[in-house]
Design a protein with these regions (language model features):
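Short linear sequence motifs
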Residues: 16, 25, 47, 141, ...
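Eukaryotic N-terminal low-complexity, Ser/Thr- and Lys/Arg-rich leader segments
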Residues: 1-2, 103, 181-201
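Terminal, non-catalytic protein-protein interaction segments that mediate quaternary/complex assembly
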Residues: 184-186, 196-492
């Protein structure tokens, strides 16, 4: 006999507080009813619950209509003033009763609907009999005193996931989990339909690019001395930004660092010490005294990025002195131009930022890898999209980082006053796509991992000036990821 569990829980897997559901989500209630009443055979399904769960249901809704209501209570003298279909003192008694009434229940689905003790008991003692988990993830920190057990990803895998929904200032989405084949339980039944499993198609494209480089990459020397395997101009990759944010799930991403680096560029800054003060060290290796001297930049102070990303974004063609100097209106402000075009000339095909200046790359500690953004305003859908070009992409360490940089740029622009747009998509185009030799084994491990659904990014405050955004203005919701255990050293 098989049965399903259905549950809604918040950030800490909390499911209830003082015998009540601590949120009001009408969409989730409709979802619960739809799942637990659906039966293609025209029969009523069975919902099994503990006594506390039964009593938490408002009296006007008891019993749950169009379903057989089975209530589990250890109190033999439990008397219910409302009609239940069966009261049992143990879960096994209920299952035996159902088995004894196959003429009545043979086509009924069985749903375990709570609470905490029953969920734990079934997952511990009847794991072999569980078919699916229907989970509503609510992305909110709510005080709870009852909790759902942690889902073991070695036993269960995601079968389906919905888009994000929002109600009463809470974001949530629906998951369906199924048991894996060859899991550690004694059940050898194949419950899964491998032709219809959840796939993160966008991250699959990223994995396929890595596989292409591993299988077909040309071995090349490079400036760092580490060496790479490389392909040129792999297929472009597109990520939809309307519902999710493309932060890598194969290893944990560092969104705060992506944000602070982008804001450094947006503010026209080139001083790595600003990042170091925020405990972000991605530029340390490329701004040491030794590295700058090797680049012929002995006149720049240690920590100076030189005439690259930030300077070229806000002062293109200007005269660069060092990271401590104030530049005012020196050079051309590409970001100011782009914002003005988005607001006042949205059909323009010239809404570009180019961070590559051939004349001055010799003055950069590291010439821009992500060096071009082209923005596109869809005036019908009211969306903003971007295409980014990477002349060079460290695919294991930096490719997803750069994708997230471009995506985050779109989100910030959409949340400026007087720009009434929402994020559309981002397309990544790449020149030299490579994996450093010291990352090859890590990349092989990463591409074998299963992807999770992407999270959602929410910008909570509008700003008059893009320079005024701070990290506390953004929130990442529903980020599931593998641990950050694949730590590759950056080649310098």
């Amino acid at each position: 006999m098989k049965y399903d569990l259905i549950c809604a829980y918040c950030d800490n897997r909390g499911i209830g507080y003082e015998n009540n559901i601590p949120w009001k989500l009408s969409d989730d209630l409709k979802h619960f009813k739809s799942i637990t009443t659906l039966n293609n055979n025209g029969k009523k399904n069975i919902v099994i619950m503990g006594r506390n769960t039964w009593e938490s249901i408002p009296t006007q809704y008891r019993p749950l209509n169009d379903r057989y209501n089975f209530v589990l209570s250890s109190k033999v003298d439990f008397v219910d003033s409302h009609k239940t279909d069966f009261i049992g003192t143990s879960f096994e008694i209920m299952i035996n009763y159902i088995n004894s009434k196959q003429d009545l229940f043979c086509d009924s689905k069985i749903f375990i609907i709570g609470g905490e003790m029953l969920y734990n008991y079934v997952l511990t003692n009847h794991l072999n009999n569980i078919d699916k988990l229907y989970i509503t993830e609510i992305y909110s920190s709510v005080e709870c005193d009852r909790f759902f057990p942690k889902i073991d990803n070695e036993i269960f895998k995601i079968k389906e996931v919905s888009k994000f929904k929002k109600e009463n200032d809470m974001f949530f989405r629906y998951f369906v989990y199924e048991k894996r084949i060859n899991n550690n339980t004694d059940d050898n039944t194949d419950n899964t339909d491998n032709t219809d499993n959840y796939i993160n198609e966008e991250e699959l494209n990223y994995k396929n690019m890595i596989k292409d480089i591993l299988e077909n990459g040309l071995v090349r020397d490079d400036r760092t001395g580490v060496g790479t395997i490389s392909v040129f101009a792999p297929y472009s990759m597109k990520y939809n930004l309307e519902d999710t944010f493309p932060l890598c799930t194969l290893k944990r991403g560092f969104l705060r660092a992506v944000f602070e680096e982008l804001m450094l560029y947006i503010r026209g800054q080139t001083d790595n010490n600003i990042l170091k003060e925020k405990n972000i060290h991605i530029w340390d290796g490329n701004t040491t005294r030794e590295f700058l001297d090797k680049r012929g930049l002995k006149h720049l102070p240690e920590g100076d990025m030189g005439e690259t990303y930030g300077f070229n974004m806000r002062h293109y063609g200007g005269t660069y002195i060092n990271c401590k100097s104030e530049y005012g209106k020196n050079g051309f402000d590409q970001l100011e131009y782009v914002i003005n075009e988005i607001k006042n000339n949205p059909h323009s095909r010239r809404i570009l930022i180019n961070l590559w200046n051939p004349k001055t790359t010799c003055n950069a500690a590291l010439p821009s890898c992500l060096h071009q953004y082209q923005f596109y305003v869809n005036t019908e859908k009211k969306t903003l999209s971007v295409q980014i070009y990477l002349r060079s992409s460290d695919v294991f360490l930096a490719n997803n980082w750069n994708v997230c940089t471009g995506a985050l740029f779109v989100y910030l622009l959409c949340n400026l006053e007087d720009i009434e747009l929402t994020p559309g998509n981002i397309t990544m185009v790449c020149g030299d796509a490579h994996i450093y030799k010291n990352h090859i084994e890590l990349a092989k491990i990463m591409v074998e991992r299963e992807s999770y659904p992407y999270p959602k990014l929410v910008v909570m405050n509008k700003k008059n000036k893009i320079e005024d955004f701070v990290y506390e203005d953004i929130k990442l919701i529903g980020y599931k990821t593998h641990p950050n255990d694949l730590k590759g050293e950056m080649a310098v």
